[in-house]
Curated annotation (Swiss-Prot):
Residues 376-399 are annotated as: Disordered. Its main location: nucleus. One of its GO terms (biological process) is chromatin organization. PANTHER family: GUANINE NUCLEOTIDE-BINDING PROTEIN SUBUNIT BETA-LIKE PROTEIN 1, TRANSDUCIN BETA-LIKE 3. Keywords: Chromatin regulator, Nucleus, Repeat, WD repeat. It holds the Pfam family WD40. It comes from the Eukaryota. Component of the ASTRA chromatin remodeling machinery complex. The gene is asa1. It comes from Penicillium rubens (strain ATCC 28089 / DSM 1075 / NRRL 1951 / Wisconsin 54-1255) (Penicillium chrysogenum). The keyword Repeat applies. This is ASTRA-associated protein 1. Belongs to the WD repeat ASA1 family.
């Protein structure tokens, strides 16, 4: 037998380690065509990282308590909006413009002095601050809606008109509140189950079907997972205060099950909206269906009965959280209390890799977007590429300086494209470090 064929592959190693946080990293999100990463920690700090230079774009103390979730989106004209949810019971929306980056604070939390006061440094614009519940340790989920009530997504042309958030109810620990921006109002509540009592809401995911139906997948302290739906598109007029008062949203339960024996720690819905996966304090990872309201298997709330999950896998490793499904659905990953990051097949749910680097427990995972990566080119690099060409027009023979500028722009574009086309996996740990991996 060929000895080369039986050689054990060397363990995977991180591409880079970001050492900026002084406390556990609880939230990660890769955005801006894989060029930016936003991270949030247990002391309330938010850091926006440039994944090309691996340096901070800005850092600020966004919350007085731990950050539960952070999301970033490009909203046109080079601007970014950062959504953060903290244990100080605030859900904040921050705006970061390209022209602001030169004077925004870049001092990382690990370098900040104890005497530094929150807000004393220059930070991004605060657009909204919603009072929401954070006692459950359950992070928000969000979805963008166009004026016709159909799913939308921020782009270079701007942000959709309406944004919806799902968060735990302030009084009913098992209930789900739905908030709306820009009105900053609560528009609906899904009450907790009374029989059986599920305990606190532990994880929630809000999404909108192509027809405009509003879905909420939720997970609970007793191990239950459920799916609710509001049928019918919510057009812009539906968010008016008077309309909501006279026409409260009606919710039907499509699915419920209790595959977990311990509190559910995380769940994520597949981008195709065909299923979702949950992880728990037990060792199980479970794939669940998302019934279509028009399918033959749809059971109205009145005649409801519990259904079976699609697949249950006993991983033999308890305490896996931060579960995320990659955009192509080929793999998903979890962050383990045992300091391991585990990567699984999206189809078979078989364990594909165990990433070992951190010494302490891991809490959060983020994937880069793998969709249409070959065509990804950042707007800034594209404009940089074109400017020297314009300068050369009418100046034939005088290419010494302009030629050099063009070369620098080309190098920058190539660096951006390399980062954009990397299959990023980021993991945040109790040690405050973020490991960046290129995998599958």
């Amino acid at each position: 037998m060929d000895t080369k064929s039986v050689q054990v592959q060397s363990p995977a190693t991180p591409v880079y380690i970001l050492r900026g946080h002084a406390s556990p990293v609880h939230a990660l999100h890769i955005y801006s065509q894989n060029l930016r990463l936003v991270s949030g920690d247990a002391n309330g700090w938010i850091v926006v990282w440039d994944l090309v230079t691996k340096r901070p774009v800005t850092a600020w103390k966004a919350h007085e308590g731990a950050v539960l979730e952070a999301r970033g989106f490009d909203v046109g004209s080079g601007a970014t909006e950062i959504y953060t949810h903290g244990r100080d019971h605030k859900l904040c929306v921050w705006k970061l413009r390209p022209e602001d980056e030169t004077f925004l604070n870049k001092t990382l939390p690990v370098d900040a002095t104890e005497s530094a006061q929150p807000g004393s440094k220059t930070q991004p614009w605060l657009l909204h601050s919603l009072p929401v519940n954070a006692l459950n340790f359950c992070a928000f989920s969000m979805a963008f809606v166009n004026p016709d009530g159909l799913p939308a997504f921020p782009s270079q042309s701007g942000r959709p008109e309406n944004t919806l958030f799902a968060v735990p109810n302030a009084l009913d620990s098992g209930g789900v509140d739905i908030f709306h921006l820009p009105s900053e109002r609560r528009i609906s509540t899904i009450p907790s189950e009374q029989s059986p009592k599920t305990g606190m809401l532990m994880a929630v995911n809000l999404f909108i079907s192509p027809s405009g139906d509003l879905y909420v997948a939720s997970a609970y302290e007793d191990g239950h997972v459920m799916v609710f739906v509001h049928r019918g598109a919510l057009k812009s007029a539906s968010f008016e205060r008077e309309y909501i008062s006279n026409n409260p949203l009606k919710w039907d339960k499509l699915y419920a099950g209790r595959p977990h024996s311990q509190p559910v720690l995380s769940l994520d819905v597949a981008p195709s909206h065909g299923y979702f996966i949950s992880s728990s304090a037990d060792a199980l990872i479970v794939k669940h269906p998302i019934p279509n309201t028009g399918s033959a298997g749809y059971i109205p709330t009145a005649g409801y009965k519990e259904e079976s999950p699609l697949k249950i896998v006993n991983t033999k490793h308890s305490g896996q959280q931060g579960l995320r499904i990659r955009s192509d659905e080929k793999v998903f990953a979890t962050a383990g209390w045992d300091s391991r990051i585990r990567v699984y097949s999206g189809k078979t749910m078989k364990e594909l890799a165990v990433l070992k680097w951190h010494k302490d427990g891991c809490y959060s995972i983020a994937f880069g977007d793998t969709e249409s990566m070959s065509s990804l080119v950042s707007p800034s690099s594209e404009s940089a590429k074109q400017e020297p060409r314009d300068a050369d027009q009418g100046a034939a023979g005088q290419t010494t300086v302009d030629g050099r500028n063009y070369s620098l722009a080309t190098v920058q574009q190539q660096r951006n494209q390399k980062v954009q086309q990397t299959h990023w996996l980021a993991a945040g740990s109790k040690d405050g470090k973020i490991s960046l991996w290129d995998i599958y």
